[in-house]
């Protein structure tokens, strides 16, 4: 839906109370947490993300690069395309590459973050049913795309997707959850169901994964001189 009332939910970074709450939480629990939020920057609005390190420090922002538009997903009405470029955040536990939702459908995003030194990729997500086609269930397609990123880049991928139903007027979207963690071979290690809130975890040895990636040589054998054509289409 498109309604100007929702612009009132946007917050400013880093002055909102939200960041103080999660900063204290991360510091207390010795954990790293990416937080996505609706950002207001002067008269511009973004779908943004900040990573809070285990000491409570806030990273610089990432602003969602790819803004979709479709029935039930009217994001171009609310969000300006991001101006930060793809980001890799150095944390206590490793280098975290973060995209937001629709970013996950673009292999350029995953490859750029991996080349920039990411140890693991994370995509906070809100994807579900398609109002224009009630019979379409894109859950497997959605997972397959990110499993492909994991396998092609030899890097673990985490996708955190919401649950529940949102309805505005005659348009309804039911989000299908199914958050998952895939390993560097593209295999799903653990997955949530479609309806329940919760969390799952998996340990990775980033040093061993880096050695595995190097042993394959597909980053060594890249030909960036041949890829410039992509930017011309």
What residue spans do the PLM features occupy?
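Short beta->alpha transition motifs characteristic of CBS
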Residues: 1, 50, 61-68, 180, ...
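A charged helix-plus-loop insertion that forms the helical arch/lid used to bind
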Residues: 1-15
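Active-site catalytic loop in hydrolytic enzyme cores
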Residues: 11-13, 20, 24, 40-148, ...
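Helix C-cap/helix->beta junction micro-motif
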Residues: 28-29, 116, 153
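Short, Asp-centered acidic motifs that coordinate Mg2+ and/or phosphate
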Residues: 32, 120, 156
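Generic beta-sheet signal
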Residues: 36, 123-124, 160
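Catalytic phosphate-donor-binding core of small-molecule kinases
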Residues: 141-148, 152-156, 162-163
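C-terminal beta-strand edge segments of enzyme domains
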Residues: 152, 160-233
């Amino acid at each position: 839906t498109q309604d100007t009332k929702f612009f009132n939910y946007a917050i400013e970074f880093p002055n909102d109370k939200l960041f103080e709450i999660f900063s204290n939480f991360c510091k207390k629990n010795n954990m790293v947490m990416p937080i996505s939020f609706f950002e207001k920057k002067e008269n511009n609005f973004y779908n943004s993300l900040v990573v809070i390190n285990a000491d409570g420090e806030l990273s610089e922002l990432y602003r969602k690069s790819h803004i979709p538009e479709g029935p039930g997903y009217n994001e171009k009405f609310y969000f300006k395309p991001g101006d930060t470029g793809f980001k890799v955040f150095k944390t206590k536990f490793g280098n975290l590459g973060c995209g937001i939702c629709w970013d996950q459908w673009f292999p350029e995003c995953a490859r750029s973050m991996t080349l920039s030194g990411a140890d693991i990729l994370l995509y906070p997500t809100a994807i579900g049913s398609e109002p224009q086609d009630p019979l379409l269930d894109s859950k497997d397609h959605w997972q397959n795309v990110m499993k492909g990123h994991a396998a092609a880049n030899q890097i673990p991928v985490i996708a955190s997707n919401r649950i529940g139903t949102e309805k505005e007027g005659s348009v309804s979207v039911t989000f299908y959850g199914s958050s998952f963690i895939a390993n560097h071979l593209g295999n799903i290690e653990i997955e949530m169901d479609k309806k329940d809130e919760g969390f799952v975890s998996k340990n990775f040895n980033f040093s061993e994964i880096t050695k595995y990636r190097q042993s394959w040589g597909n980053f060594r054998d890249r030909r960036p001189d041949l890829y410039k054509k992509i930017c011309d289409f």
